[in-house]
Amino acid sequence: MNWVGGSRSRVLIKQERRKQKEYFEKHRLKSKMKSLGVLSPVKNSAVSLDILNLYMVNQISCKKKIPETVRKPTHVNMNRDIKMPLRKHNLELTMSPHCVPSKLCLDDTETNVNCQRLSSKEDLGPVQSQGMDSYSMLHPQFSKIENCSFTPSSFSVELPSNRHISKLNFTSGIAPTPQKLAYEKKQNDQRSTVNCSDSLLSKLNKSQDVFSPSHKTTRFGTLFERLNSLGNRNLLTKSPAVIMDEDCRSTDEIRQSDYITEKHSIQHIWGKNGKEVSNFLEDVNQSTPNLLSENCDSFVSQNMINVLNIDEQRIKKTFNKCDYDSMGDTCVVTSSDKNHVTDRCIRNIFTVPELTFSNSTLNKTSYPEKCQPNKKYQREYNKNERNDLSTSFENDYYPSSSERKEKFENDYQEKTPQKSIQKYPANSMGNIPSEELHSKQSWDFGLDEILMEEGGIYSLKSKRISTKKISLDSAQSSRSTSYSPRPTDSCFSSSSDLPSEDEDQISQQIEDSNRMTIKTKEKMNNFYVERMAKLSGDRIVKNDDKIHKQNENFYQFSVKNNTDQFPQLQCNSAHILQNKTNDNCVLQAARCDAGIQTESESVMEEKLDVAIQCDLISKCTCRSDVSLCNLERCSGNIKADTTGGQEIHKNN
């Protein structure tokens, strides 16, 4: 029951404040007792605060100790009565040890240094630098010998470009004998007077062995000599490359610069004749091992020389086999090799932008009079080279590719009856120029000859052809088709009114496709050779994606058109023609996963666009592919989601 005027609430608030105050005071007393070490009182909460305070004061007073008086020591001055005068004396500071003056005769060294400065300002003559002071201070036993630490000799080589490149041969080490010093002075005078030529380089290399056995020739001087020697052509083109001790990369840079100097001359020889190119390559490949064998004593290993000899023999063999007509095969052979040094060098040679490397088919169009008599020989050579390249590449890089190949064929034989085939209208090939198709097919390594000999089945100039094309990724083609990572797109497009000629052409092409099964294994080899050329480097092939798709299209077309699936193809063609002629349908972009199709026909639904812009879901009569057709042609439950949210069920 509330009191009048809220007095009850005021009393309660006062009591709460008192309780809080007592609580905090108790905590303060406890903290003080703990700090002073006084025993805590009896744990009785009923004791009033005043009694508790008295108790605490009593305890504190009892524990308080009286401090003892500490006696301070009194200072007794013994000299209290005696007065001592203050002494004034200088401070003695610590001195450095007494230095003994050196007895060295520095007059000769000063005159030599002055002469050096004058001679270096006047002309770039021979310079003799002597670091005598520091060496004589550390080693006084050599104080009489002047030229002890550093005796560089210099000379200038006159080049055809009227440049004077000074070349220093730094030698440092223990001080030589006076006889050797006199001999070195004579050599320096002779070098400054004589105009250096090719004979002078050989004399200096011989004389260096005479007067420097006791010296330790620094590594920089010898490597600088090797760089600027006439054997290396790097002196005129670029600054000398940095040579690390025995690293093969430095030799690669030297070889690359040698090939760059010869790149301009090969562009003039390239268009004339294949024999001149082969002779030029033989000269280049003969010159490089000789250069490296001369300078191989410190930074070229024996393995590099062996590699160069192997490359030379291989290039000779390929040019002799190829009969100078198919340059593309030669480039593929050299680029598929494991030796990356010759790979980079050959790439530097064959950098003519106007020429694309093709095999005998492209040469057949450009030079028909050359390639026709050698057609059989080239076909045998291409076949052997493709087999060798595919087997060696599979053994080296993909050891399990042969097993994949067998599994790939078996799975294709099983899975091809369930896959749908892409069809284009009859006039689709007519719009594409024959030159573009021929340039795309030129990288198929002899595939064009097979197509040319089929009696005009796939002739490039005929325009009334409807191609069957299945676009698969290169990753799917290498795997078995029992599992497909992503669905492949099979695009169906046809016009509403097809003439009867198209039906005849489709049936004729299905019959002709059975003839292509004989060439399946050869196209398998072509497929793997093309894939190997792609993996060996994208520096040869610029339009790699187009070439990939073209190879896969030819390969899959040949594999799919077997005799086992001939009735299936007839059924598909008849069924599609029925949909084309009877229905006013536009078949567009139907997606179907080739890897998960089974023999049972799956019922597929589709979305239909009607004039009121609502999604109509229906079951198509074909039940194999998704298509967009009119509302009257579809049977099944049609659910129209209108804007008002109503559901309409119709049965047509």
Swiss-Prot record:
Biased segments, Polar residues type: 389-401
Keyword DNA-binding: yes
UniProt key word RNA-binding: yes
GO biological process assignments: meiotic cell cycle
Residues spanning the membrane: none
Molecular-function GO term, any one: RNA binding
GO cellular component labels: chromosome
Chain intervals for the UniProt region annotation (Disordered): 363-434, 469-506
Keywords, in A-Z order: Chromosome, DNA-binding, Meiosis, RNA-binding
Ranges of Low complexity composition bias in the record: 473-498
Annotated disorder: Defects in this gene may cause non-obstructive azoospermia.
Function: Involved in recombination, probably acting by stabilizing recombination intermediates during meiotic crossover formation. Required for normal germline development and fertility. Required for meiotic progression, complete chromosomal synapsis and crossover formation. Binds double-stranded DNA. However, also binds branched DNA molecules, such as those containing a D-loop or Holliday junction structure. Probably not required for formation of DNA double-strand breaks (DSBs).
Note: Incomplete or abnormal chromosome synapsis and significantly fewer MLH1 foci observed in spermatocytes from a case of non-obstructive azoospermia.
Record's protein name: Regulator of DNA class I crossover intermediates 1
Species lineage: Eukaryota, Metazoa, Chordata, Craniata, Vertebrata
Name of the gene: REDIC1
